[in-house]
Amino acid sequence: MAVYYTSRSRYQNKRFCVDYWTITRTCFYRFFETEPDMKALFPKIVQMNESNQLEWQMDRDMLQKHAVTVMEGLGAAVESLEDSDFLNSVMVSIGQTHVRRNVKPQYVKKLWPSLHYGLGVCLGDHYNKEVSEAWRKVYIYISAQMTRGMKNPNLKTNDELS
């Protein structure tokens, strides 16, 4: 199930013949193609050769696990748009997790073009201008909250305060 946001109905769930794995695999393959330096941040996914150089060969199972996590996070974000405290808490926490893995705030923005590409390829005509713009806005919001968590790794989230 792919989730997308529209201005008409806040958000909608639509069933497509595409699953999270297909969208995210397309996104990450594109990401590693257009941002090859980012492969070093994914040591469990991207394989190294005997010369200690990054290879295109990837651990499919680890990529799939990460892909599902990413898309479930995006889906949860869209479904939580009306509960900004919860959404902010989750995204800040995800940012804190990423900074512990040496992901820098400026890297988060680098993923959008590849996600945009992956959604376009996989959703086809359903990924029209309105849907694309809605996803872009959601991604900007998510990125801002993740960056907040990255810049404040010790910030308590709502979940931790409960």
Please give the residue ranges for each predicted region:
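Globin-like tetrapyrrole-binding proteins
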Residues: 1-162
